[in-house]
Every structure is written in C-alpha cells, then in structure tokens.
Regions:
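Extracellular/secretory pathway-exposed regions associated with glycan biology
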Residues: 1-40, 44-135
Length: 135
C-alpha cells in the first residue's frame, strides 16, 4: 500500500464489453493501530477477498458459486498495539464478468473498527509501504 494511492477505488474488472487484463490484485504494506485494543476488519467485496495480518489469514469472503454478489464480512477481533507496525496483505480475485447488458465495476474495500475507532477506511497515516519498497 502506498500512502498516496487510494486503496478503496473500484477495480477495472472484466466485462463482456471490455476485457481487462487484471483479474486478481494483491496489496502489501504495513498497518499501525492508534490504540492498544481489539480491532475488527471489514471487507466489502463483490467477488473474493483475503486479508492477512502478519501472514495470518484473518478474513476471507468467497464468491457465491463463483458469481459476484456485493456483501460485507467481518473478521474476529484482532488485538493490536498502538504504534506498532504489522504487515497487511489484501488479495482480491475477480471470478467472472457480469451478464451482457449489465455494466458493473469490481468493488473491494477494507475498513476497520474498534472500541475507540468508528468503522471506516483505514487512514493513510496508519498505512505505509512494506520494507524494501521500491528497491
């Protein structure tokens, strides 16, 4: 995740009218909590998403019968320490195009919430590229 790159924008998924070369995506970076408490991660996605913290799968949402459908899923609470950077990996898979005549961009968002943090986008100040980024 690059701090100046939006991470919650629709992806250019394949459609019958405009095939896109990108059918999967992977974001790697680091995340820092504001408070030492349990955080819940939420994924809004129309296909399939996996969210990992420090290499451990904390959230997975699969496409229903390999067909896209918009749904929100939440992780179990994850304990994080204030100011400590942890690795975050988000993987996305576009399963199939929408039916002819139905134009829909792919969607995927990752939010967080905690006792002190209202559910919403993870602020850019709490994200940074992984070590060795650009080297």
């Amino acid at each position: 995740l690059h701090p100046v790159t939006p991470y919650n924008v629709p992806l250019p998924g394949a459609t019958p009218h405009s095939a896109a070369p990108l059918k999967t995506a992977k974001w790697e970076g680091q995340l820092k909590a504001e408070f030492s408490e349990d955080y819940t991660f939420h994924a809004n996605v129309d296909n399939e998403v996996w969210v990992f913290l420090d290499g451990k799968l904390i959230l997975h949402r699969g496409a229903y019968r390999r067909r896209p459908c918009w749904v929100s899923v939440a992780s179990d609470p994850i304990p994080l320490k204030a100011g400590q950077w942890v690795r975050i990996d988000v993987r996305y898979k576009e399963w199939r195009a929408w039916p002819v005549g139905f134009s829909q961009a792919s969607h995927m968002q990752v939010h967080w919430s905690s006792a002190s943090t209202k559910r919403g986008s993870i602020p850019c100040k709490n994200l940074r590229p992984p070590p060795q980024f650009g080297k």
